[in-house]
Amino acid sequence: MARLLFITSNRIGDAVLSTGALEAARALVPGAGVTIACGPLAAPLFRAEPSLERIVVMEKDKLAGHWVALWRDLIGHSYDLAIDLRGSATSYFLPVKKRIVFRSGKAGGHKLDELAALMGSDAPLEMKIHLDPRARRDAKAFAGADKKLLLIGAGANWIGKTWPRENFAALAKRLTKPGAPLTDARIVVLGGPDEGGVLDPLAEDLQK
């Protein structure tokens, strides 16, 4: 059986964006068993991937030790295709028939455009997350009786990636006003435990 190695992000948002590249990679090696390497936060996103052989969770280590650990974990396997969205040298030290390694483009370019170019697509790649029964149950329990939800992930791992909270608030109100696509939707602000400084003021803005 063919095998696909997909190295993606530590961060949830970037990992979601990368799912389009994963779908494009599948088309290059149909039916391949898939190994995904990513950070612990992103790992649950991929647990229901079709033909998944395993998820290798990369725990960040000093002096790039996590890359050495990843190489040691993978060295006993060969791959027909390796996609490395982290731009590391890992795949060059593995038995790989073909590799596609991300190199950062011009400053200011959107990640989706960069990923599309990497995979040879003229249009942004459609993102897709496969859900297992547990995820569907959790989503149903979270949504409750609400038929429409607007989820906002306003945080980021550094200030250069953040969008002004005023913009999030204005967009949310525009999408949920009478006659809009998400009229009367429940607005949910999502984030990690260290993002309260961004998310709490946004939640207050949305209640005004």
Residue locations for each model-derived region?
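Catalytic machinery of carbohydrate-active enzymes
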Residues: 1-208
